[in-house]
Amino acid sequence: MPSKVLILLRHGKSAYPDGVADHERPLAPRGQREAGMAGDWIRLTQPPVDAVLCSTSARTRLTLTASRIDAPARYADTLYGASAAEVRREIASTDPAVRTLLVVGHEPGIPDTALALDPGGPLAERIADRFPTSAIATLAVTGSWADLLDSPARLTDFHIPR
């Protein structure tokens, strides 16, 4: 039986206002709506989120707000443009008492992390094919968060809120 649940959420659809740096781009109306739907799905189908690890970009912070997930959040600059290895290093530093962790980040780091942790099976094929904005991958973790540096997890669900 898994001891922990990892939820990977790609930020909502962003807007592209003139003169706004990439890091500061806000969510588009669709992104706001779908981030709310993502939060609804997470609350309905997953254990309560104990902690959140979120990129510092405006669109990830706004995605977390729109999701209405109420849990202590840690914001990490390293998640902005992060590789799967960098995302895994951030996850590994999570408090061992956390049983359900939500990570809000970007492409390619979020889908690549899901695939690095569980590269086989039908869910991995779907994720490799397409991981759009506001998509969610959930994984069962049998060891500690630190174990994810060199141990796999098992993909349990992949959801695209629309």
Where do the model's predicted regions map?
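Domain-level recognition of soluble alpha/beta enzyme cores
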Residues: 118-154
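A structure-centric signal for secondary-structure junctions around beta-strands
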Residues: 3-4, 98, 133, 152
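Generic beta-sheet signal
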Residues: 6, 96-105
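A short beta-strand-loop-alpha-helix capping motif that often carries His-Thr
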Residues: 104-109, 139
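Active-site-proximal alpha-helix that buttresses catalytic centers in soluble enzyme cores
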Residues: 2-86, 110-111, 116-117, 122-124, ...
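Short, solvent-exposed aromatic-acidic interface loops
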Residues: 153-162
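Short, surface-exposed amphipathic charged segments that create phosphate/polyanion-binding patches used
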Residues: 88-94
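Glycine-rich phosphate-binding loop signature in dinucleotide/nucleotide-binding domains
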Residues: 45-48, 94-98
